[in-house]
């Protein structure tokens, strides 16, 4: 979303983003004001992962709507269009605000697996098992809609009622509309036609990053062969110490140096040997061109950045669309999908062994040339043309 907001501003549009406070620094880089909404995403994720009894999806939904919808309502004042992405509940609140104010509404998904299609099944919903004898994708998507209603219907409709709006009986389709955008690269995440509604695939919304790498990191890169970069990004990772040990041992087993991204798991090095370096948030667009491989959680942004850099990747998916991205990486032959969310030294070393083969490296290099970098600008132009028309 930050890349899209920056592209809109570069084209002369007045833009404001209503989002959790975690995004303030990113938005400052593109000169777009943040209207804070809700609690920190990092803190919310930490609480969910740390809790012995995680809150129910319905309780989380109610909390997200309560924390964000009023802020969205204020931020939308005077706007011509409201673009929503991300969590269903946050988008549902935004949709209700746009409906109440009579503002044009657009929804963008970051992966095809969030949009109903006859060509693949939906992501599974926690606590909503699918009958084993059901294999028709359209039926599975109908069951998915029912599950979404069961989880999110009450809090979404309660908020709508507070605005004097009627209830909706299909939260998922209400949020995504019949003309959503797909903010994902067509090579990595193609939208398959024919489908039941009109999807506009804009390409991934990449935020250009021109920041130099820190001096210590530059020195480490220059001191030896390209390392393997490992980070789980925004995933807290239970048993982080054991995960860090498994990661370092797995990379060393492949005869490679280790670049450990601390991420929200706060991973730390297991010893003081000079073949390892821990780094925080850095310019991944520059870094990934200089590593032997990338091990990550499978977020849409990290997967796209890695593919665009031409680095082979190992995806260790944790939740949601990360499973989709892991499968796409494996299907394209640009890396491997780790089996399960918790890597061991042995399992990760085996996955890296495949990712580092000459065949996978060559395939990753070839696919890199097909990844578009103009998705955010394309989407911004499309939106401004629609508003002007």
Segments (PLM) and residue ranges:
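Nucleotide-activated sugar donor-binding and catalytic core shared by glycosyltransferases
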Residues: 1-16, 22, 26-29, 56, ...
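Donor-nucleotide binding loops and adjacent catalytic segments primarily
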Residues: 5, 184-293
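Conserved nucleotide-sugar phosphate-binding/catalytic loop shared by glycosyltransferases and other
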Residues: 16-57, 133-136
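Generic beta-sheet signal
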Residues: 18-20, 37, 106-109, 202, ...
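Conserved nucleotide-sugar donor-interacting segment of glycosyltransferase catalytic cores
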Residues: 66-138, 187-189
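Structural motif
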Residues: 80-81, 179, 227, 293
């Amino acid at each position: 979303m930050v890349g899209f907001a920056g592209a809109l501003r570069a084209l002369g549009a007045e833009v404001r983003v209503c989002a959790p406070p975690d995004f303030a620094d990113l938005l400052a880089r593109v000169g777009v004001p943040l209207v804070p909404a809700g609690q920190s995403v990092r803190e919310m994720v930490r609480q969910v992962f740390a809790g012995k009894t995680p809150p129910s999806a319905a309780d989380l939904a109610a909390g997200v709507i309560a924390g964000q919808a009023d802020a969205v309502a204020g931020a939308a004042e005077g706007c011509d269009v409201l673009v929503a992405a991300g969590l269903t509940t946050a988008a549902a609140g935004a949709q209700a605000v746009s409906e109440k104010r009579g503002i044009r509404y657009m929804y963008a998904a970051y992966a095809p697996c969030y949009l109903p299609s006859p060509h693949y099944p939906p992501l599974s919903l926690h606590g909503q098992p699918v009958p084993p004898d059901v294999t028709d994708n359209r039926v599975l998507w109908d069951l998915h809609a029912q599950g979404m209603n069961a989880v999110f219907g009450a809090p979404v409709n309660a908020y709508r009622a507070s605005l004097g709006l009627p209830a909706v009986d299909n939260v998922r389709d209400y949020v995504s509309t019949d003309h959503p955008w797909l903010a994902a690269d067509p090579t990595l995440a193609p939208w398959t036609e024919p489908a039941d509604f009109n999807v506009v695939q804009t390409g991934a919304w990449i935020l250009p990053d021109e920041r130099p790498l820190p001096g210590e990191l530059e020195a480490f890169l220059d001191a030896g062969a390209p390392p393997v970069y490992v980070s789980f990004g925004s995933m807290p990772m239970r048993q982080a110490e054991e995960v860090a040990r498994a990661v370092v041992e797995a990379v060393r087993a492949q005869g490679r140096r280790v670049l450990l991204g601390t991420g929200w798991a706060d991973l730390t090095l297991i010893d003081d040997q000079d073949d390892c370096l821990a780094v925080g948030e850095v310019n991944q667009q520059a870094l990934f061109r200089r590593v032997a491989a990338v091990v990550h959680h499978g977020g849409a942004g990290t997967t796209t950045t890695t593919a665009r850099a031409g680095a082979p990747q190992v995806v260790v998916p944790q939740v949601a669309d990360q499973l989709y991205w892991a499968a796409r990486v494996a299907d394209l032959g640009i890396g491997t999908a780790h089996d399960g969310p918790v890597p061991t030294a042995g399992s990760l070393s085996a996955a890296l062994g495949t990712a580092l083969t000459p065949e996978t490296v060559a395939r990753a290099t070839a696919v890199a040339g097909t990844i578009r970098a103009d998705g955010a600008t394309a989407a911004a132009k499309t939106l401004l043309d629609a508003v002007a028309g």
